């Protein structure tokens, strides 16, 4: 019987790569999307020989989270908390600073906690499971001048949750990992950091990064898949700096 993975935010960026990696490794994949504008049917149609199903989810709405938990055919073997808002994408939700701060905290941190609180007990009851949290190098590992406060706070909260769950579940069959990506070539990063720059300015930003390039979202997805293997158990509870060195040298962006 195929293992099941639930991936929140599976229609673009890192989440879309998670869908692809797990589908191609024989998992039954359940992914979430916020609206039909994300074209979830196209994601599903990409895998005619695999079981890939989309579920609508609003992480800011507890009723929506409860509805998702009830709609799942069973408890996932792997739960990947990937969905979230960024400092620019949050502008699609609300245009006030207060509303944006609230949305960032509620979607990125509180919604993730709500969903985890509904599904983790079932994993513990079963005696096995993998939980992967997506934070960010900004907030989860270090800080950058000018970084959106609420965005950074939400990512710091996810890193805290990962460490605490790692401690609480250390002697259970459920493993927990937190990944903190650096500058990754996703629509969210492009919107927050690159799209307002001209071509030369974009090249300058990328040239200032470790390894002189953006991280490919596939690299983060492959790391996540590794964590679900037996070899990944060694990293239970770890908050992984997956930034190619930006987390230990954040000043690179200021040069």
Regions found by a protein language model. Give the residues of each.
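Conserved glycine-rich Rossmann-like NAD(P)H-binding loop of the short-chain dehydrogenase/reductase
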Residues: 25-41
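Conserved glycine-rich cofactor-binding loop
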Residues: 11-12
């Amino acid at each position: 019987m195929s293992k099941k993975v639930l991936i929140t935010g599976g229609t673009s960026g890192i989440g879309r790569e998670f869908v692809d990696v797990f589908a191609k490794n024989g998992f039954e994949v359940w992914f979430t999307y916020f609206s039909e504008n994300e074209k979830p049917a196209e994601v599903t149609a990409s895998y005619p020989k695999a079981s890939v199903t989309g579920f609508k989810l609003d992480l800011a709405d507890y009723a929506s989270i409860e509805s998702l938990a009830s709609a799942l055919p069973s408890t996932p073997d792997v739960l990947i908390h990937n969905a979230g808002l960024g400092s620019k994408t949050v502008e699609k939700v609300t245009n006030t600073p207060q509303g944006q701060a609230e949305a960032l905290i509620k979607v990125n941190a509180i919604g993730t906690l709500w969903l985890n609180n509904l599904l983790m007990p079932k994993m513990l009851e079963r005696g096995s499971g993998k939980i992967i949290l997506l934070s960010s190098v900004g907030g989860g590992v270090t800080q950058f001048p000018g970084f959106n406060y609420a965005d950074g706070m939400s990512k710091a909260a996810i890193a805290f949750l990962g460490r605490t769950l790692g401690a609480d579940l250390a002697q259970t069959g459920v493993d927990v990992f937190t990944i903190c990506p650096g500058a990754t070539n996703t629509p969210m990063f492009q919107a927050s950091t690159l799209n307002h720059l001209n071509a030369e300015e974009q090249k300058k930003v990328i040239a200032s990064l470790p390894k002189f390039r953006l991280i490919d979202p596939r690299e983060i997805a492959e790391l996540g898949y590794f964590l679900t293997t037996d070899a990944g158990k060694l990293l239970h509870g770890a908050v992984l700096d997956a930034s190619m060195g930006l987390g230990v040298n954040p000043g690179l962006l200021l040069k």
